[in-house]
C-alpha cells in the first residue's frame, strides 16, 4: 500500500499563498479543461469543504490520465478530511486503482466498503480477469454470492472468462446454472461469454446450441463461434459459419477476420486468404497487431513466405506473437538459417524478449534444417538462463525430435533418461516416430509399449508401433497391435489430402472412390504410373504396412491420397501451373519420391504441406533435401 500519511501531509502543507487566480473556477471545470494540477491545488485550498462532485471530477480526470500519484492525493485528502465517500465514489476509487494496475489497493478499497453494490463487485472481478488473475476473480465472485449480492449480466459475462483459465468447465457449468435460474441466458453479453467458454473448453456442440438459441446476435457472438471452430481445427465449419453470418448481414470486425484467417491457414486456402486481406484493406479496419499476426501466419502456412516477411517487415510495432509467427513459418519450410538470422535480429533489437514459443520455433528450425549441434547449443543456453526462458517439456521434446530426425536414436534415448522430470507422452512420441523412420525396433518397441500405457486412447501410438513392426516384417506383432486397437475401440485418424481448384476444395482419401471425377482420376493415374516408371520411379514397397504380395502392395501405393490429389491437379490445372497439395498426416517416403519424379516428368512445381512441414519440389528436387 502506498504511504498515505506522507501524501496526506503533503496535501495540507502545500502553501496556497502563491496560488492566485482572478476567478476561482469550479474543480469540475478545471478537470474538464485538462487543468488537473490546478484542480488538485483547489482541492487542497478547499480542505474539508470538498464535496462529492469535486472528488468525482478529480477521480475521473486521474483515471483518464492514469495519473496514479495524483489519484493517491485525492484519496489521501478524503482520509485527512474524514470525508466518508458514497458507494459510488468508493467504486470509482476501486476502478482507478485497478486501471493503474494497483490491484492490492483496489482490493483494499473493496474490502473497506461498508456497502458494496453490483458495480463494485463487477469492477473488481473484471479487473482481476483482464489482468489474468482468474483465481482471484473467482474468489471475489464467491464472496459476492456469500454476501447475498446479485450478479447482473456484466458480472456473469466477466466471470465466465475466468472459469476456463482457473477452474475448468466444472465451475463454468455451475455458473451457467445460475445464469439460467436468474434468466440472464438471453442477454447477448452473457450468451457470447457462455459460447466462448464452451468453445474454449472444446465443447463446440454446446457452444453452437447456445449460439443458435440467442434471441439476437452481434459481431461479438458471431466472432466467438467462428473463433471456437477455428481454435479446435474445425476449419471448414469456421469458414461455413463465416459465409453464413456474412450472408445474414453480419459486419465482421478485425477479430472476426483474425479468426477467419486462422481457419484459412488450417485449410491452406491462399486465394481465400488474399480475398480476406483485400476485404480488410477495403473496409479500412484497424490494422491491430492481432490481425497482422494472423495475416503473417496465414501467408506462411499457405506457402507464401515472401509476402509474410513483407508484412512482418512493414509492421510499425511487432509483438512476441509477430516474431513467433514468422519464425514458425520459416521453421515449417525447413529454412533453419533464416530462423537463426531472424532470431538474432530479434535479440539485437532488444524490443521484444524471446518467450517459450520463440525458443521452440528456433529449436524446431534447427531440427528441420539439419543443424543439430546449433540446436543443442541453444538448448544448453536455455538451461543456463541465457535467454530468460527455462526449457519446458515441449523444448525437451523438440531436442528428442531433432536427434531422432538425424538418426541419433541412442543419443535421443539417453537424453530422455537425463530429463529432470518424467518424460511426457509428447516427448516419447517424438522418439517413437524417429524409431519408425530409422527402423530402430528395440528402442521403438519399448517406447511404444510405454506410450500405450500412458495414453491408451491415442490411436497414433498404436499406428506408429504397428508400422514399425510391419517395416521389420513382424506381422504377428502387427496383428496383435491392431487387435488391441479393436479391443479398446481406438480408431485411427484417416489420412486425407486436398487441393483447391476454382474456389472449391477437392478431398481425397486412400483408394478414394467418392470423388465426382474418380473414373477420370483413376484412368489418369494408370497413365501417369507408366510414365513415372519409365522416368525411374520405383515403388517403395516398405511403405505398405500389410502382409500382401508385391503386386497388391504396388496397387495400394498408387491409391495413396497424395497421389490422387496430384493426379487431379494435373487434370484440372493448365500446363505449367504449380500444383499445391495438402495432407493432414505425415507424407510417406514413397509419395515423397513420387512427387519429386512427378514434378520433373510433367514440368510442374509441386508444393506439398503435410502435418510437419512444407515440401517445395522443383524439377525433381525438394526443398527438404530428403530430410524430414
UniProtKB/Swiss-Prot annotation:
Renumbered residue ranges of the record's region Type E(+) motif: 503-533
Compartments where located: Mitochondrion
Transit peptide, residues from-to: 1-19
Stretch list, region Type E motif: 427-502
Pfam families given in the database record: DYW_deaminase, E_motif, PPR, PPR_2
Keyword Ribosomal protein: no
PPR repeat positions: 51-85, 86-116, 117-151, 152-186, 187-217, 218-252, 253-287, 288-318, 319-353, 355-389, 392-422
Region (Type DYW motif): 534-628
NCBIfam families assigned: PPR
Protein's name according to its UniProt entry: Putative pentatricopeptide repeat-containing protein At3g13770, mitochondrial
Organism expressing this protein natively: Arabidopsis thaliana
Lineage: Eukaryota, Viridiplantae, Streptophyta, Embryophyta, Tracheophyta
Encoding gene (name): PCMP-H85
Amino acid at each position: 500500500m502506498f504511504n498515505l500519511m506522507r501524501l496526506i501531509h503533503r496535501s495540507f502543507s502545500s502553501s496556497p499563498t502563491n496560488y492566485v487566480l482572478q476567478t476561482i473556477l469550479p474543480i469540475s471545470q478545471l478537470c474538464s479543461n485538462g487543468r488537473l494540477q490546478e484542480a488538485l491545488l483547489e482541492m487542497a485550498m478547499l480542505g474539508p469543504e470538498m464535496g462529492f462532485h469535486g472528488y468525482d471530477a478529480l477521480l475521473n480526470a486521474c483515471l483518464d490520465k492514469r495519473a496514479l500519484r495524483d489519484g493517491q492525493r485525492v484519496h489521501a485528502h478524503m482520509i485527512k478530511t474524514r470525508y466518508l465517500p458514497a458507494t459510488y465514489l468508493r467504486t470509482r476509487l476501486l476502478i482507478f486503482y485497478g486501471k493503474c494496475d494497483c490491484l492490492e489497493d483496489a482490493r483494499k478499497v473493496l474490502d473497506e466498503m461498508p456497502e458494496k453494490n453490483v458495480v463494485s463487485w463487477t469492477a473488481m472481478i473484471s479487473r482481476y480477469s483482464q489482468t489474468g488473475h482468474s483465481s482471484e476473480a473467482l474468489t471475489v465472485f464467491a464472496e459476492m454470492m456469500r454476501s447475498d449480492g446479485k450478479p447482473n449480466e456484466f458480472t456473469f459475462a466477466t466471470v465466465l472468462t475466468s472459469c476456463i483459465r482457473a477452474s475448468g468447465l466444472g465451475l463454468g457449468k455451475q455458473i451457467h446454472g445460475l445464469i439460467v435460474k436468474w434468466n440472464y441466458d438471453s442477454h447477448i453479453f452473457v450468451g457470447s461469454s457462455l459460447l466462448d467458454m464452451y468453445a474454449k473448453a472444446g465443447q463446440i456442440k454446446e457452444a453452437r446450441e447456445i449460439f443458435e438459441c440467442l434471441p439476437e446476435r452481434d459481431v461479438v457472438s458471431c466472432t466467438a463461434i467462428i473463433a471456437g471452430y477455428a481454435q479446435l481445427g474445425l476449419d471448414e465449419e469456421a469458414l461455413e459459419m463465416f459465409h453464413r453470418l456474412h450472408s445474414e448481414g453480419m459486419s465482421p470486425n478485425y477479430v472476426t477476420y483474425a479468426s477467419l484467417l486462422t481457419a484459412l491457414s488450417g485449410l491452406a486456402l491462399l486465394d481465400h486468404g488474399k480475398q480476406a486481406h483485400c476485404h480488410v484493406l477495403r473496409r479500412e479496419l484497424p490494422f491491430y497487431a492481432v490481425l497482422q499476426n494472423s495475416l503473417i501466419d496465414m501467408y506462411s502456412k499457405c506457402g507464401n513466405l515472401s509476402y509474410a516477411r513483407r508484412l512482418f517487415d512493414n509492421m510499425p510495432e511487432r509483438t512476441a506473437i509477430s516474431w513467433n509467427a514468422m519464425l514458425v513459418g520459416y521453421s515449417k519450410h525447413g529454412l533453419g538459417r533464416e530462423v537463426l538470422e531472424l532470431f538474432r535480429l530479434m535479440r539485437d533489437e532488444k524490443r521484444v524478449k524471446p518467450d517459450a514459443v520463440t525458443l521452440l520455433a528456433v529449436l524446431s528450425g534447427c531440427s528441420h534444417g539439419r543443424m543439430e549441434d546449433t540446436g543443442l547449443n541453444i538448448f544448453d543456453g536455455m538451461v543456463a538462463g541465457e535467454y530468460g526462458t527455462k526449457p519446458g517439456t515441449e523444448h525437451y521434446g523438440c531436442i528428442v525430435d531433432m536427434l531422432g530426425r538425424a538418426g541419433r536414436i541412442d543419443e535421443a534415448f539417453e537424453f530422455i533418461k537425463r530429463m529432470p522430470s518424467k518424460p511426457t507422452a509428447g516427448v516419447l512420441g517424438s522418439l517413437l516416430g524417429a524409431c519408425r523412420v530409422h527402423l530402430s525396433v528395440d528402442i521403438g518397441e519399448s517406447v511404444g509399449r510405454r506410450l500405450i500405457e500412458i495414453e491408451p486412447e491415442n490411436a497414433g501410438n498404436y499406428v506408429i508401433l504397428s508400422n514399425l513392426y510391419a517395416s521389420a516384417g513382424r506381422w504377428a506383432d502387427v496383428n496383435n497391435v491392431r487387435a488391441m486397437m479393436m479391443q479398446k475401440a481406438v480408431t485411427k485418424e484417416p489420412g486425407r489430402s486436398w487441393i483447391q481448384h476454382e474456389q472449391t476444395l477437392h478431398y481425397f482419401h486412400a483408394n478414394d472412390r467418392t470423388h465426382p471425377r474418380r473414373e477420370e482420376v483413376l484412368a489418369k493415374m494408370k497413365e501417369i504410373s507408366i510414365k513415372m516408371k519409365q522416368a525411374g520411379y520405383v515403388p517403395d514397397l516398405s511403405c505398405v504396412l500389410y502382409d500382401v504380395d508385391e503386386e497388391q502392395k504396388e496397387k495400394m501405393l498408387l491409391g495413396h491420397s497424395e497421389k490422387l490429389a496430384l493426379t487431379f491437379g494435373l487434370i484440372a490445372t493448365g500446363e505449367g501451373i504449380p500444383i499445391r497439395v495438402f495432407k493432414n498426416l505425415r507424407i510417406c517416403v514413397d509419395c515423397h519420391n513420387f512427387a519429386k519424379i512427378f514434378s520433373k516428368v510433367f514440368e510442374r512445381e509441386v508444393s506439398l504441406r503435410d502435418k510437419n512441414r512444407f515440401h517445395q519440389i522443383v524439377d525433381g528436387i525438394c526443398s527438404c533435401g530428403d530430410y524430414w
